[in-house]
């Protein structure tokens, strides 16, 4: 399966594919191209996956002919969530940041005959948007079957709280289309098998002293600690909870992400 990863960031969807391959050894994929507007994200993606062609081009410039030439069988995407966030202006499709998504839905999905699978991730609230309405209508018109989810990583054994909307779609007509959002995974057998090996705490997700990483680069100085210690959201390796990082992480002290501290196995806060 040849995959096109759009709004690719640092490669989260690609990592998800690799995780799925551990459980489904016969599952084969090839991410043939990744596209994101952020130069910084693209540099990180290239570091993580040096064999993937990474582009900083405008998604609105993609054509059905190009995707057919690349024989794209699947599109994985995480479109900008700002037009749909509950804290934002909720301009939906009137927000210019929705234009690349609309181009995908209106120009690419209906006209790329090789396309058989779609995976989309977005913020909670997308499911109530006009953009969502346009997406599911297009999928139905193009003979896709789809299922939608509102789930949090903690439900999958991952120590992070980040409720998100997911949609999976396929042209496989044997796929059972759901008539409502799924938020309870307790009865999903595949979920039980795939994530039972996951760590329940942060220990396996953080850097250790023997990693090629200089801790001095990210240590908080006494001035910052003295001013903001009471609002820091502190976690340790044994913590079973974390929240997502925002763009303001490193600039603002409160509500932008977790601070990790590791001093032996204990911490005392005055």
Show which residues each predicted segment covers.
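Core alpha/beta nucleotide-donor-binding catalytic domains of modification enzymes
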Residues: 1-115, 124-130
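Class I S-adenosyl-L-methionine
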Residues: 62-72, 84-252, 262-268
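Cytochrome P450 core scaffold surrounding the K-helix E-X-X-R motif
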Residues: 254-257
């Amino acid at each position: 399966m040849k995959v096109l990863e759009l709004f690719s960031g640092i490669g989260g969807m690609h990592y998800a594919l690799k995780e799925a391959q551990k459980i489904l050894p016969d599952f084969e994929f090839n991410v043939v191209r990744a596209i994101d507007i952020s130069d910084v994200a693209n540099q990180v993606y290239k570091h993580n996956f040096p064999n993937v062609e990474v582009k900083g081009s405008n998604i609105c410039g993609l054509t059905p002919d190009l995707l057919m030439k690349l024989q794209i069988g699947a599109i994985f995407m995480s479109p900008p969530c700002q037009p749909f966030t509950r804290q934002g202006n909720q301009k939906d499709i009137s927000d210019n940041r929705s234009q690349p998504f609309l181009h995908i839905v209106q120009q690419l999905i209906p006209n790329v005959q090789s396309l058989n699978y779609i995976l989309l991730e977005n913020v909670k609230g997308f499911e109530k948007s006009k953009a969502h309405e346009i997406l599911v209508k297009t999928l139905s018109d193009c003979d896709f079957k789809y299922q939608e989810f509102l789930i949090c990583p903690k439900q999958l054994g991952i120590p992070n709280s980040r409720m998100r909307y997911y949609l999976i779609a396929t042209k496989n007509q044997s796929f059972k289309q759901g008539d409502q959002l799924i938020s309870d995974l307790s009865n999903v057998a595949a979920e039980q098998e795939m994530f039972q090996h996951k760590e329940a705490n942060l220990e396996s997700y953080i850097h250790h002293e023997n990693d090629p990483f200089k801790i001095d680069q990210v240590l908080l100085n006494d001035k910052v600690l003295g001013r903001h210690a009471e609002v820091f959201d502190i976690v340790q390796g044994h913590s079973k909870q974390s929240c997502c990082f925002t763009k303001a992480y490193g600039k603002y002290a409160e509500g932008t992400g977790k601070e990790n501290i590791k001093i032996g196995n204990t911490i005392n806060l005055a």
